[in-house]
């Protein structure tokens, strides 16, 4: 069965399924959603000023629901290729546990709900950025870029980079140079992260015709690009210290983490072409996840430490 045939077969399924709550939760891409929630929370913490704790909780929940909605829409559209790729074949739609029409309705309802509640409860700037993020991921990336260009991850990575900017906007009702730097850290991190995955999943992407960079330009070009983006990410991650919204101590931590990130990318660059085990690529993929969590954790710890010092100084 071809990708097109499989897509048509899935589309004919108009009957209501007997999906469980767990199946619907899986549609939300919970692992991706956890990263979105974490970086959005970082934006809330790092932004100057304060937000009512209840409104902050509502903001995080809306961002989480919006991220889950875009994940559901992505799974709806990609059900045809998900059924072929070993990494995604057990997802609810290709596995037959949820009908495509149900997934589409689920994603659309959650999208509208998350944007409306965020706008009404917090502010419409953050809601507007959330709406654009959902649209960008579900339409621009999923329906257009992913299957048409090897730069899909580079451009499409913007969708995953918006959450800290949304969190920041929830507090300040503005987009600033600081929130743009938080955006850029994730935006520049994304290619190295996903191309490491694409290297050891080349056959899967080739089977479904998704033009990932390793399949289109080869392993050597991909490895060079991975190193370049790792270097850019490491530099950008130090900028909060340079711009003054993080301390020198944070800058040292970010520099050390960046050095390890670059080292792992160089290990991938030195990996022989055609290496079937792809161990350096797998290590880079795993470390890149830790790296992003560590950078944003360090930023939040640094911010909280500064607040405690300021509070202690003011109470003397």
Curated annotation (Swiss-Prot):
Enzyme Commission (EC) number: 2.5.1.141
Q: Which GO terms describe its molecular function?
A: protoheme IX farnesyltransferase activity
Entry keyword set: Cell inner membrane, Cell membrane, Heme biosynthesis, Membrane, Transferase, Transmembrane, Transmembrane helix
Q: What is its main location?
A: membrane
Q: Where are the transmembrane segments?
A: 32-52, 53-73, 93-113, 116-136, 152-172, 180-200, 226-246, 248-268, 289-309
In the bilayer, the protein is annotated as: Multi-pass membrane protein
Q: Which reaction does it catalyse?
A: heme b + (2E,6E)-farnesyl diphosphate + H2O = Fe(II)-heme o + diphosphate
| Annotated protein name in UniProt | Protoheme IX farnesyltransferase
Pathways per UniProt: Porphyrin-containing compound metabolism; heme O biosynthesis; heme O from protoheme: step 1/1
Q: Which HAMAP family match?
A: CyoE_CtaB
Q: Which GO terms describe its biological process?
A: heme O biosynthetic process
What else does the entry mention about this protein?
Answer: Carbon 2 of the heme B porphyrin ring is defined according to the Fischer nomenclature.
Q: Which family, according to the similarity comment? A: Belongs to the UbiA prenyltransferase family. Protoheme IX farnesyltransferase subfamily.
This protein's species is Rhizobium etli (strain CIAT 652)
Presence of the UniProt keyword Transmembrane in the record: yes
Q: What's a GO cellular component annotated to this UniProt protein?
A: plasma membrane
InterPro entries per record:
Protohaem_IX_farnesylTrfase (IPR006369), UbiA_prenyltransferase (IPR000537), UbiA_prenylTrfase_CS (IPR030470), UbiA_sf (IPR044878)
Q: Which PANTHER family match?
A: 4-HYDROXYBENZOATE SOLANESYLTRANSFERASE (PTHR43448:SF7), PROTOHEME IX FARNESYLTRANSFERASE, MITOCHONDRIAL (PTHR43448)
Q: What does this protein do?
A: Converts heme B (protoheme IX) to heme O by substitution of the vinyl group on carbon 2 of heme B porphyrin ring with a hydroxyethyl farnesyl side group.
- Give its localization: Cell inner membrane
């Amino acid at each position: 069965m071809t990708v097109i045939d499989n897509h048509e077969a899935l589309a004919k399924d108009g009957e209501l399924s007997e999906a469980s709550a767990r199946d619907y939760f899986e549609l939300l891409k919970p692992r991706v959603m956890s990263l979105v929630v974490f970086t959005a929370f970082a934006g809330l913490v790092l932004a100057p000023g304060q937000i009512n704790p209840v409104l902050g909780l509502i903001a995080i929940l809306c961002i989480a629901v919006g991220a889950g909605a875009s994940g559901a829409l992505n799974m709806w559209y990609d059900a045809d290729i998900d059924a072929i790729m070993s990494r995604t074949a057990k997802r609810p739609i290709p596995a037959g546990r949820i009908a495509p029409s149900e997934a589409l309705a689920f994603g659309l309802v959650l999208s509208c709900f998350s944007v409306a509640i965020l706008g009404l409860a917090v502010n419409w700037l953050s809601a507007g950025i959330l709406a654009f993020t959902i649209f960008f991921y579900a339409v621009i990336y999923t329906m257009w870029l992913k299957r048409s260009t090897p730069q899909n991850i580079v451009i499409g990575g913007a969708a995953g980079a918006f959450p800290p900017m949304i969190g920041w906007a929830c507090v300040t009702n503005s987009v600033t140079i600081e929130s743009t730097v938080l955006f850029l850290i994730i935006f520049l991190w994304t290619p190295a992260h996903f191309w490491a995955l694409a290297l050891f999943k080349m056959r899967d992407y080739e089977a479904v015709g998704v033009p990932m960079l390793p399949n289109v330009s080869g392993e050597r070009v991909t490895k060079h690009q991975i190193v370049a983006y790792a270097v850019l990410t490491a530099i950008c991650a130090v900028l909060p210290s340079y711009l003054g919204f993080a301390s020198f101590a944070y800058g040292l931590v970010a520099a050390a983490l960046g050095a390890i990130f670059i080292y792992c990318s160089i290990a991938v660059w030195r990996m022989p072409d055609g290496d079937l085990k792809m161990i350096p690529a797998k290590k880079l993929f795993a470390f890149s996840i830790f790296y992003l969590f560590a950078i944003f954790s360090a930023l939040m710890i640094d911010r909280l430490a500064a607040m405690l010092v300021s509070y202690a100084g003011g109470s003397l």
